[in-house]
């Protein structure tokens, strides 16, 4: 009887541990590395890779999405630099 209890508890412990690891990885990748969906730290290198593959429809979709992200980052950088320059 006690062997069944130990096996059940061990199985449940491993199951909860895997669930925790999965949730932690998901939150970690979204919070600490928001550009991680491209496997890059900056959008410029991702944009250059996507531009090489833009012949395919998926490559073109990724190219557009990354170029929009890059434009938004550049606009935010310019706005921040203007605020620093004015103050």
From Swiss-Prot:
Stretch forming the signal peptide: 1-29
Annotated region (Disordered), positions in chain: 32-54
Secreted in keyword set: yes
Primary location class: secreted
Protein keywords: Secreted, Signal, Toxin
Compartments (UniProt record): Secreted
KW Transit peptide (keyword) present: no
Tissues expressed in: Expressed by the venom gland.
A GO CC annotation given for this chain: extracellular region
TM ranges: none
Domain of life: Eukaryota
GO molecular function, one term: toxin activity
Family of the protein in this entry: Belongs to the scoloptoxin-23 family.
Protein name: U-scoloptoxin(23)-Er1a
Organism for this UniProt entry: Ethmostigmus rubripes
